[in-house]
Structures are given as C-alpha cells and as structure tokens.
UniProtKB/Swiss-Prot annotation:
CDD domains: MetAP2 (cd01088)
Protein name, UniProt field: Methionine aminopeptidase 2-2
Keyword annotations of the record: Aminopeptidase, Cytoplasm, Hydrolase, Metal-binding, Protease
Top-rank taxon: Eukaryota
GO BP: proteolysis
Length: 486
C-alpha cells in the first residue's frame, strides 16, 4: 500500500537464487521458496516413503550380508537364480510379498494427519495446520559487505525482535502467497467483477488465518492488513469496491494492480502485483517489476533512501512501451513512496521515493520495509480522485469532545474492531454497522479519522505496481513475501 509523499500527502518475475543467510532466529529446516515446496517442508516426501515404495515393488532394502542370498528385484519373473557363498547355483521360487492393507492412521477427530493435508481451492485450510511446526522462510539475500552473521549480531537481533516476530511475519507471508496465487489462477479473469475478486481475496485471508474478525478483539489477532486495492489503468492506488456502487467488470484490455496486506498479531505483510492480459503492456510490467527488484537489491542496513530512489528511477525510466502504435516512456511516479512498516501501522515514519531525491534517512537493522514502485505512461504524478478507499484512525486525537451520538458510537466500533489498521466501508457493513456516513463525516471533520481517496494519473494512461515486504537482519535481508509468482 503506497504512502503519499510529503509533497502530495500476467507478468511476474521469478525469484532469483541467493546465498544462504543465517537469520536472526535461524530455521535451517525450512524451504526458502514459500508454498512451492510446502510438501517437502511438511515431510510428505522423505526417505521412509522411498523405502516403503521399494518394498512394495519387491526390492530388498536391507544391506546384503555374507551368508545371505543376493536378491535383486525381478518383478516380472516367477523364479530367480541365486548364488550361495560356496559357489553353488540354485533356483528358488520368488516369494511374493503380501500387500499391506494398513490404512492411514487418522487423528482423534477422524481427519487425516496434518502432514497429509493439501490446500483447497478456494483456500480454506488454516496455514497453521499446513505448517504445524515452522513457516517457510522468505528469500534470504546476504549483504555484499559481510560474509557471516556473528553470534553477537544474533543476540542483538533477538533483543530487537521478540520470539513471535519471525513466526508471525512468516505466517502472514505464507497466507499472502497462497491467497494471491489462488486469485491469479481462479479469480482474476476477464469478465469478473472487482467486487468478487476483492471478496475472494479477503475471504481467503480470513479463512487461512483462522480469524473472521467478527467478534470484538478477534481482528487484532490476524486478518487483513488493509483493504484490497484493485486499481485499473490510470488509477494507480487506493481503490476498492464499496457497497451499493455499480459493479466494475475486468476487461481483457485492462491493467490491474492488486495490492493487499495480511497481518498476524499486527505484523503486516504488504505485497502487490500487476496483471495484464494483453502482451502490449509487457514492457510496462517488466520496467516496474525490475525497478522493485532493484530497490530490494539496494536496500539494507545503512542504505540511504536517496540512493535507493535514484537506482529505482534509473532502471524504470530506461524502459519504454509501445501501445497501439504509439511509444511512451515509462515514468517513475514521483509523489507516492515505499515505506517502513510498524506493528499495526502500515505506514511508519520513513519513506522511499522512486526518484532521485535528497532524503538522507538511512535504513536500520531490525526494521521492516515495503519496497514498492509505481510506473506510468502518463505524467508520473498522482492526484486525489473522487470516492473513498478507506479510513484510518488517528491515534493522537481523542474523541472525548464529540457531541454527535452517532460519531461516538462509530468511534467505539472502530477502536474495538480495527484500531489503527486501515478499514473500508465493506468492513464496517460486514460487522452490521448501518447509517454511519454522518458519524464518519463528523469524525473526519474533527481529525479523529483520516479518509483515503483513490490516486490517479491522467485518463488514458496506464500504471503498474510491484511490491514486496523485507525484513532487515544483521547479515542480510529477508524478502519475506517472495514467491514463485513474483
């Protein structure tokens, strides 16, 4: 989810291989490729399974000893010739192995063990059930200036991050991967309504996290990190379907940005991708994807925001795209930025512009960042559009002086159900809240709630976005949201 700069306040990359990095809380048994290696991570495939298969095919899995018959497999013969230790050759009937009729053991509840489970479509199996011990690690990228992570650095990281930090983030990332990959395969198709896509994504996140967010306090345990952004063409960011608005239907000529967040105990994973069905947009998507990967490459402890922004702009603006016979330069959008992420706050205090700038802020060890870029065939500058994307609570403002009863009641619901996490009108109505517009206006007028509008470039232009969340370890960065798709 892009952060507005102070001035303005089906193409996917393959993850690259990298050297192994020792993270703050090392999990050496876990795959670095996310859900793509889930079966191996959960132990579905292993040496024991190979032995059992061999035995079923008549293969002797024991090591031959002196004095024993050497019995190679002969699956199509009734007799085998064997040689004893004294040199005699004899013929024996091949013994037939009885087929095992053992049934798979079930749990007390009658279900198959967790190691036998697969994700469903639509995704409804809890990620915590699929990964009962540890969650997959993101892509680990060591810093160029270090060869190893010292024990002292590991102890320092352990003080920065509590014991739940990495498990929470990795669980949120795995939920994001599984839901978005389902969306890419089953939901995002020409003719689909944007409302059906948004609801499909959000239903998947709630199902895999195990928290529907309908009871007071449940939303704070896990769920959506912010409303699903579904932005078409010149709409770059912050658009989501609202209740009782006309359905928007996805067309095969559209360029769709999909941006959603997942949180577990307030640890928010923010990741986005762009989908286009017409290959004439390929260069636009490639430019933005490569710019995001460039930002990730340059990110790290002590990296300056100015240097990252300059590198992003250089890569993105080296591309041009031909659309319907006209050539457009790809421009880095200059008044929206990447950002750091704090607990229960999608936007922290630091920003990463996509252009060359004078921001001398540095990244620090233990921080979490959303590295994202937006590219456009238009002006490369965004304006607020009509409509509402969502709302965010201003924690610095008290509601003690509110006079309107509807505003007081609505604020109580917001504090109990969302806290500082951005929410949409659909989320309010899902809780059964009605007639809230007047109360919401009063909260906005008093500075207690901030309203977010869609951000657009000029009509007729096309915009694209790619984004990943990274964690800054001592010896390297973990691209926590990296997957096989991008």
């Amino acid at each position: 989810m892009g952060s507005k700069s102070p001035e303005g306040h089906r193409q996917a990359p393959h993850a690259s291989n990298c050297n192994e990095l020792k993270p703050a809380n090392p999990d050496p048994q876990i795959s670095q490729n996310g859900s793509g290696s889930a079966d191996l991570d959960r132990g579905v495939i292993g040496d024991d399974d190979d032995d059992e298969d061999a035995e079923e095919n008549g293969v002797n899995t024991e090591t031959p000893n002196v004095g024993k018959l050497n019995q190679p497999p002969f699956p199509n013969l009734d007799q085998v010739h064997v040689t004893t230790t004294d040199g005699l050759c004899i013929t024996e009937k091949k013994k037939k192995r009885k087929k095992s009729n053992k049934k798979k053991k079930k749990t007390k509840s009658g279900a198959l063990p967790a190691t036998e489970l697969k994700q469903t479509s639509p995704p409804r199996v809890l990620v915590s059930t699929l990964f009962p011990s540890e969650y997959p690690v993101g892509e680990l990228v060591p810093y160029d200036c270090t060869a190893r992570t010292t024990d002292e650095e590991l102890r320092y990281n352990s003080r920065l991050w509590d014991d739940d930090f990495l498990p929470d983030y990795r669980q949120a990332a795995e939920i994001h991967r599984q839901v978005r990959q389902y969306a890419q395969k089953e939901l995002i198709k020409p003719g689909a309504t944007l409302l059906s896509i948004a609801e499909g994504i959000e239903d998947g996140v709630r199902a895999l996290s195990g928290h529907q967010g309908l009871e007071p306090g449940d939303f704070f345990k896990a769920g959506m990190g912010f409303p699903t952004g579904l932005c078409l063409n010149h709409i770059a960011a912050h658009w989501t379907p609202n209740p009782r608005e006309k359905d928007v239907i996805l067309d095969k000529g559209d360029v769709l940005k999909v941006d959603f967040g997942v949180h577990v105990n307030g640890r928010i994973v923010d990741s986005a991708f762009t989908v286009a069905f017409d290959d004439k947009y390929d260069n636009l998507l490639t430019a933005v994807r490569e710019a995001t990967n460039t930002g990730i490459k340059h990110a790290g402890v002590d990296a300056r925001m100015s240097d990252i922004g300059a590198a992003i702009q250089e890569v993105m603006e080296s591309y041009e795209v031909e659309i319907d016979g006209k050539v457009f330069p790809v421009k880095a959008i200059r008044n929206i930025t990447g950002h750091d992420i704090l607990r229960y706050h999608i936007h922290g205090g630091k920003q990463i512009p996509f252009i060359k700038n004078n921001n001398q802020d540095k990244m620090e060890e233990g921080e979490v960042y959303a590295i994202e870029t937006f590219g456009s065939t238009g002006r490369g500058f965004l304006d607020d559009d009509v409509g509402v994307y969502g709302y965010g609570r201003n924690e610095n403002m008290s509601g003690a002086n509110l006079r309107l009863s509807s505003a007081k009641s609505l604020l109580k619901t917001i504090d109990a159900s969302f806290g500082s996490i951005v929410f949409s009108r659909r989320y309010l109505e899902r809780l059964g809240v009605k007639n809230y517009l007047l109360g919401m206006k009063n909260l906005i007028d008093n500075g207690i709630v901030e309203c977010y509008s869609p951000l657009v470039d000029v009509k007729g232009s096309y915009t694209a976005q790619f984004e990943h969340t990274i964690l800054l370890h001592s010896g390297g960065k973990e691209v926590i949201s990296r997957g096989d798709d991008y």
